[in-house]
Amino acid sequence: MEVLREKVEEEEEAEREEAAEWAEWARMEKMMRPVEVRKEEITLKQETLRDLEKKLSEIQITVSAELPAFTKDTIDISKLPISYKTNTPKEEHLLQVADNFSRQYSHLCPDRVPLFLHPLNECEVPKFVSTTLRPTLMPYPELYNWDSCAQFVSDFLTMVPLPDPLKPPSHLYSSTTVLKYQKGNCFDFSTLLCSMLIGSGYDAYCVNGYGSLDLCHMDLTREVCPLTVKPKETIKKEEKVLPKKYTIKPPRDLCSRFEQEQEVKKQQEIRAQEKKRLREEEERLMEAEKAKPDALHGLRVHSWVLVLSGKREVPENFFIDPFTGHSYSTQDEHFLGIESLWNHKNYWINMQDCWNCCKDLIFDLGDPVRWEYMLLGTDKSQLSLTEEDDSGINDEDDVENLGKEDEDKSFDMPHSWVEQIEISPEAFETRCPNGKKVIQYKRAKLEKWAPYLNSNGLVSRLTTYEDLQCTNILEIKEWYQNREDMLELKHINKTTDLKTDYFKPGHPQALRVHSYKSMQPEMDRVIEFYETARVDGLMKREETPRTMTEYYQGRPDFLSYRHASFGPRVKKLTLSSAESNPRPIVKITERFFRNPAKPAEEDVAERVFLVAEERIQLRYHCREDHITASKREFLRRTEVDSKGNKIIMTPDMCISFEVEPMEHTKKLLYQYEAMMHLKREEKLSRHQVWESELEVLEILKLREEEEAAHTLTISIYDTKRNEKSKEYREAMERMMHEEHLRQVETQLDYLAPFLAQLPPGEKLTCWQAVRLKDECLSDFKQRLINKANLIQARFEKETQELQKKQQWYQENQVTLTPEDEDLYLSYCSQAMFRIRILEQRLNRHKELAPLKYLALEEKLYKDPRLGELQKIFA
């Protein structure tokens, strides 16, 4: 505190000198002016003060009444541990140190606000803020990084505003209480998030400072939703191709240079006007979106988390707003100033000026000039002393005394009084309060749900709007989880009415993306597949009412592309479909990758089947260092004419262009065999196109069934939702219960009441054994009869009551209301159910009673206590 004290003393001395000069000048001026002027001046000052009071009274601090309240009265403290209700001696000592530190700070910095050191907890016990932090590493891998931790805290808790936006809260609850009630203010959010980040290995601190209105109220209506920001596309630099020496020179440009210059000027003027229009439109939108001036700007208290660089490979310092879970630069304008910050080891006061928000702050906590610490012996090392300062500490005795003095002043932070922070798997999965949360962004609305809360697996929906009032919808994005059809994302463009479904690997049809406007067949659609999961290597299929294009990869025949053009369907009386009445194929175009096993002049690059014109066109791959490729065209004719005569292959039926005609001359037989092979290939290609049409119909039918059922998958390890596992567990419990009842029944001693009538230790005679057996069987028989009579009595009672109710209904049927009739029908249904159950129990009892009687008789014969019976029946 020495540097702080010297600085404050210098400022006080300068203020006293300035005040003395001002008082002397005012006294001289007062003596020189007349009395009337001084009276008028006093009147003006009073009017100015009244005007100022009036303006200040108009400033109202409003707190939204819709936000939920979270006070100590709503917290059950009866089950909290003793550490929440009392302080240890070490904690009491720490509070005394904090009070002393606060008194010195208030004395040396009277213009600064009081420090936020030891607010009350939920049990009305003062606790130091550093001991409220409980560093905890969560058992979930998803919460190991700062971004997932911040997003979890933002989703899990509900924001509660500060009671007074100009002051820190009087209470700071434990993280366990905040997690239990899922509510808290910014300080509660920061405490929980900081505890999780420190437990994960980050150098994190809770900050007490000042924020903007949007930051304090969690108002994101002027923020762009992160999900709408498209990633920047990396622009690949085109490599300049060096011109070859013997390239063909381009033809001379005969266009007028003057006309070209005039056209360039005209285009520049058009671009300038368009740029001006866009700039004016942007300024107009910015003016409309501009926030209204805040009367309390710079005074609103807020708490957030500071993460310093170094640990966990953090490259630079940054802020985390716990309300939203978003990260911000330390230069961001939303953060207007810092009063203090703390972690689980120490407490620091910011001694730097925040006139330029937090942009000029240096977060070197080891610098006591910029950051005044409360406790010695922290993990932040002090700055190294300069040579001038170090020259005065050369004496070894002084160094030893200095070390002893520091040791005496050091004080270790007590352990946290908060219990271990725990998040149950159910709470971690549910995340949002009641399983749902809605966040309003600029021209966007984000809705979140817990998994399995919606029957269709919907977990998130992003709706983007055209205007700031969020009335005209542009597009909707819906994210799904645990879908049996592997649906992951559904994108709906309201402008074009285009729907796009994205799937994870594992769909029965290996779907990756399905874009469509209508689920009706033979409409515009694009279907992408996971080609590695398909036998044919199909990557993408594009369909229009008249065409179908398919892209392949990794096929053994090197097919890469197939395009089919269709003609109008022939009209029939019955309903037409792709299976019963397929569309006539007009043209099929197929392209192939290069087959290195064949020479280029024999490897087909493209073949076109002109079905309507009965022609087949072939184009082969180019040789290396060639710019043209060989081509052939076959005139496909029927093998016999109208009279049944066989047509002979003629040279005019094959038109060819050879790059090297002297190397290979194809004979007529080769051309005939090639044409026969192409006919077979054409037939096969037409069949594959027909199969593709049928596959599209099958996919559409399957997608309609999947959307109607929207079945969700449940892990075998999820015993809470897995019905099969639940049924098996209940069956095992039922079997164990029945086994327990059987064991109890076998251990039941029927002879005990009758043996108690005899003197203890007396040996039974033959006559006594027979008498005990008969009495026991007679008693058991009577119990069976009584049980049957009881069931019969209940059966007759229920039957009589039902008959009375039916008779009452017959008598009052005309005057009954519909509600009375519903009650009567409900009663009859329940009564019939009870009567049926009693009848079944009575019949079952009648069947089992003789068996139970015989089982008891056999058990008595084998009882060693009635051994005389065995001698009689031996």
Swiss-Prot record:
Name of the gene this protein is made from:
DRC7
Region of interest (Disordered), residue spans: 386-410
- Where is composition skewed (Acidic residues) in this entry? 386-400
What the entry lists under InterPro entries is as follows:
CEPT76/DRC7_peptidase-like_dom, DRC7/lobo, DRC7_C, MORN_DRC7, Papain-like_cys_pep_sf
Spell out the protein name for this chain.
Dynein regulatory complex subunit 7
Keyword Transport attributed: no
- What does UniProt give as GO cellular component? cytoplasm; cytoskeleton; motile cilium
Q: Which residues form a coiled coil?
A: 1-67, 257-297, 688-711, 781-807
Quaternary assembly? Component of the nexin-dynein regulatory complex (N-DRC). Interacts with TCTE1/DRC5. Interacts with DRC3 and GAS8/DRC4.
Q: Where in the cell is it found?
A: Cell projection, Cilium, Flagellum; Cytoplasm, Cytoskeleton, Cilium axoneme; Cytoplasm, Cytoskeleton, Flagellum axoneme
A Pfam family of the record is DRC7_C
